[in-house]
């Protein structure tokens, strides 16, 4: 007899775990199945060492506030990302208050700093500060172009730096570092203890087919099948091939562009302990979002570490532990032309990736020394980061490369997939609430679910910033 579940979640990363946690909070009676092809949860892009950036709140990531023709900066994307991360904090604060989530195990206070040099970039950062600091979401943003003050904010960055060109920085002290791998495991452990979730690892999904009764039949490696009225594909780069196998019409418009990454990791613990900040610079023209250079304090499984990068690369794999055939296998008649159009129309990006692939160890050290003038090669080792699959979407103007995430859902709400990358994990709660809105709309509108949502999110139905002081106090930020 085929097992039947209320929901099947493919991929044991932060997205699927967040959706499982939300579903359980809204309906504790739901029977959930999570399928993971690897031997444990959060081993791909959710892992702290694989994630291109953590604690994204648009505090310091300059690519979220592009400069416009009149010299001002666009703020809409930064505000949306900031609100999305605040929603995550609100959810964690509620679970913390209930004693259901050990937030210190994954959440740490780390200041967020934007750092630039050169007259043009200093002027850009000043304009960004003037606009953002006037908004409630960024009211705590500090500005400085004083080298002595900057040395207090980030001593290693200023140590040994010449005075030949202007420098400036902004800082938000309420920044965070989030170990999404640890958070994923905490969510899943709690769900498994409750009996609501069955997690199967080492279990690959081969196919998805729609049955006459509206259920999905999910075929596993080995031939076993499970049935469910709802499937979520949260398998990172592996979501696109599974979405294509579902054959829903909404999948036809999409293709993927894989981008790999590498970090320089500091092997000197004493050196790493002298830097406590996420320091983001300004990306080069044509660079994908995951390649914005930053000197990044991270807490990985409780240990403080220091990373620089990521350096971009190219691989045809859709997952770090994927196959080189992932990209060619994803090509369809409907997405081949959009893929070719993106390749032809994004020459700066292609050129950037080629240059990154050609980088020597000496060139990577030079890039690091722009942030740490006294960095020595012997203190740093090169490590492979996670794999990202950016969205290629066919539209009225042909194939377009989308640098972000998108929820793709069947018209009847029976299946949803998350495609793309950046800001990703930091917006998981908001993104999974979108999945609920699109796939569980009727239940979401019921008084019972609305009451539970209001309990989980005190600001529900209003301005998420109204919960900021409460979130700060509960989470100790």
UniProtKB/Swiss-Prot annotation:
<dbReference type="InterPro" id="IPR006231">
    <property type="entry name" value="MQO"/>
</dbReference>
<dbReference type="GO" id="GO:0047545">
    <property type="term" value="F:2-hydroxyglutarate dehydrogenase activity"/>
</dbReference>
<keyword id="KW-0816">Tricarboxylic acid cycle</keyword>
<keyword id="KW-0285">Flavoprotein</keyword>
<dbReference type="GO" id="GO:0006099">
    <property type="term" value="P:tricarboxylic acid cycle"/>
</dbReference>
<keyword id="KW-0560">Oxidoreductase</keyword>
<protein>
    <recommendedName>
        <fullName>Probable malate:quinone oxidoreductase</fullName>
        <ecNumber>1.1.5.4</ecNumber>
    </recommendedName>
</protein>
<dbReference type="InterPro" id="IPR036188">
    <property type="entry name" value="FAD/NAD-bd_sf"/>
</dbReference>
<dbReference type="GO" id="GO:0008924">
    <property type="term" value="F:L-malate dehydrogenase (quinone) activity"/>
</dbReference>
<keyword id="KW-0274">FAD</keyword>
<dbReference type="Pfam" id="PF06039">
    <property type="entry name" value="Mqo"/>
</dbReference>
<comment type="similarity">
    <text>Belongs to the MQO family.</text>
</comment>
<comment type="pathway">
    <text>Carbohydrate metabolism; tricarboxylic acid cycle; oxaloacetate from (S)-malate (quinone route): step 1/1.</text>
</comment>
């Amino acid at each position: 007899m085929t097992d039947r579940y209320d929901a099947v979640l493919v991929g044991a990363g932060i997205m699927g775990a967040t959706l499982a946690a939300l579903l359980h909070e809204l309906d504790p009676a739901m029977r959930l199945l999570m399928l993971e092809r690897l031997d444990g949860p959060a081993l791909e892009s959710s892992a702290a060492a694989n994630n291109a950036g953590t604690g994204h709140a648009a505090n310091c990531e300059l690519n979220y506030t592009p400069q416009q023709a009149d010299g001002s900066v666009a703020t809409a994307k930064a505000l949306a990302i900031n609100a999305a991360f605040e929603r995550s904090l609100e959810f964690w604060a509620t679970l913390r208050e209930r004693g259901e989530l050990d937030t210190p195990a994954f959440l740490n206070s780390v200041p967020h700093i934007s750092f630039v040099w050169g007259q043009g970039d200093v002027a850009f950062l000043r304009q960004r500060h003037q606009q953002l600091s006037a908004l409630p979401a960024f009211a705590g943003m500090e500005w400085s172009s004083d080298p002595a003050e900057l040395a207090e904010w980030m001593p290693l960055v200023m140590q040994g730096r010449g005075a030949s060109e202007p420098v400036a920085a902004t800082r938000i002290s309420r920044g965070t570092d989030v170990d999404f791998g640890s958070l994923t495991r905490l969510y899943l452990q709690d769900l498994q203890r409750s009996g609501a979730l069955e997690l199967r690892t080492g279990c690959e999904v081969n196919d998805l087919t729609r049955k006459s009764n509206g259920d999905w039949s999910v075929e596993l490696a080995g031939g076993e099948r499970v049935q469910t009225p709802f499937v979520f594909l949260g398998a990172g780069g592996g979501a696109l091939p599974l979405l294509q196998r579902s054959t829903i019409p909404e999948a036809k418009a999409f293709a993927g562009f894989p981008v790999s990454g590498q970090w320089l990791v500091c092997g000197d613990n004493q050196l790493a302990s002298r830097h406590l900040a996420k320091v983001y610079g300004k990306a080069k023209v044509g660079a994908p979002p995951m390649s914005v250079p930053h000197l990044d304090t991270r807490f990985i499984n409780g240990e403080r570490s220091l990373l620089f990068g990521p350096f971009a690369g190219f691989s045809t794999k859709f997952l770090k532990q994927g196959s080189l055939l992932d990209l060619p296998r994803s090509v369809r008649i409907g997405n081949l032309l959009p893929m070719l159009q993106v390749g032809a129309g994004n020459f700066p990006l292609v050129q950037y990736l080629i240059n990154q692939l050609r980088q020597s160890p000496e060139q990577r050290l030079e890039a690091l020394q722009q942030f740490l003038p006294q960095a020595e090669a012997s203190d740093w080792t090169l490590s492979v980061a996670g794999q990202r699959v950016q969205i290629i979407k066919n539209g009225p103007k042909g194939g377009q490369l989308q640098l972000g995430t998108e929820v793709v859902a069947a018209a009847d709400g029976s299946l949803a997939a998350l495609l793309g990358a950046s800001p990703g994990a930091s917006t998981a709660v908001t993104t999974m609430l979108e999945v609920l809105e699109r796939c569980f709309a009727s239940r979401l509108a019921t008084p019972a679910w609305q009451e539970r949502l209001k309990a989980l999110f005190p600001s529900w139905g209003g301005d998420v910033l109204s919960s900021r002081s409460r979130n700060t106090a509960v989470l100790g930020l």
